[in-house]
Each structure stands twice: as structure tokens, then as C-alpha cells.
Amino acid sequence: IMIKFSPMLDITAALRVLGRDWDTHIVAVNNEVKEVLFLTGTGVMHAVNIRGMQTDRFFFSPENEQQAQLTIAADIHQYIYEPNAAIIKAGAYRLVGERYELQKLDTNTHLYTSDSFISCFPGRVWEVIKTEIKEPKKQLDTKAKYSILSRNYPLSPDDIRKKYKLKDGDDRYLLA
């Protein structure tokens, strides 16, 4: 038996209703969750992200996630990692860090850090250029185009862009 749900579904609530004997398949295309499927099975979570000819797969059980050790970083290392949307939707917040030996930046964000570059990481990776900007108006290159990510920060990407007069684009990434 297979049941198809909207990508907006609360998977934890659905599993409470359906029971634990369902495999959950979260399918994303280019980091956007498109399908949430439940198939009769053994309770395995399948987080899949399709990017062109490549497919990232991350499988786990809810018990794996519960038992995974969470390490919080004392500071930001050379690389920042963001798991793909399927992994986030599946709820593998601790396990992705444990499997790839990453430290989480904060308990309330899904960004991780490491001094090692992991080419096979299922998500986005950024190399850190600066970890702290004390005077953004002076230090940010207003001629460059920025893609801005705001996680657990009081300003939205649009507010940051307006405040510092930054152009939208993919020349550089600014993480707030």
C-alpha cells in the first residue's frame, strides 16, 4: 500500500496516526520537497533529493535520530553545511551531523560546521571567508551581488539587503 501526501504534511503527526510500520519517502527535486509518500514497511525514513543526473539519498530510522549525539560548535569553522530540504523535512537534525562528523551551529538552526570539506555532503556547502563583520556598511562589497540566508536572525534577507544596500545575486553568500 502506498499513500501520497502534500509536501506540507507534518510527518510526525501522520506517523502517530498511521502507526510505525510505514516507510516514509520524502522526495525533493533541486532542494524543493515535491512528494511525501508512505509505503507499508519497517519504519525507515528515505530522504531523496534529485539534482539533474545526481541523486542524494539519506536513510535512517527514527531511533537512529533519537540516539544520535548532537555536538554544538564553540565557533564557526572553515566550512558551513546545510542539509538538503528532504533531510530537513525527514527530521534528521542530529543524525546528519553525526554521520558527517559535523558540529551544529546552534540547537535551533539546521546549519553545521567543520574544518573538513565533505564533497559528498547531501546539501549545500560554503567556505567561510569571514566569521564576524563588525561594521557591515564598511566591510561588505556593495558592488558584489549577494544571496542572503537568514537563520534565527531578527532581519529577513530582504531587510538585510535594504539596510546595507546590497544587490541580489549569486556572486557571494551572506549568512546571518
Where are these regions (language model features)?
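SAM-dependent transferase fold signal centered on methyltransferase-like domains
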Residues: 2-176
